[in-house]
């Protein structure tokens, strides 16, 4: 089987906006014969992430155990989405979301991401989306909510 001609990167933060972007990226990928890669960036501490995810059970151990548990948790969630949408690859990163998305975008043909903002230009697009648009080396498709 020939490898896909195009490849799309879809940043996922598990919000409804990012999942809508994934659905749209999937439709486009099917039409174009492109591959999908899902990326999740953990921007906050693992302790805060565990609490935000309602997974306080993961906090019973040293911080390395918490980090490993959260990484595993997000990897499982990404794998589930990848299976559902036929993504070829999943990636996990830690750091500032916009910076990690731009770094990961190199080598892809398109980044497809959601828009969750509320007011003003950065609010309209969302701060992360605006930063990615301003600095990304490849085209970015922004899917409105």
Where are these regions (language model features)?
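A short acidic, glycine-rich active-site loop
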Residues: 56-76
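Small/aliphatic-rich secondary-structure junction motif
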Residues: 2-60, 104
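Short, acidic/small-residue loops that bind anionic groups at enzyme active sites
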Residues: 135-145
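Structural beta-alpha unit
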Residues: 1-4, 17, 79-111
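General small-molecule cofactor/ligand-binding pocket signal
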Residues: 37-39, 89-93, 141-143
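Short beta->alpha linker loops
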Residues: 42, 73, 92-96
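Glycine-rich, Arg-bearing micro-motifs that act as flexible, cationic patches
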Residues: 110-135
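Short secondary-structure boundary segments
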Residues: 40, 114-116, 144-145
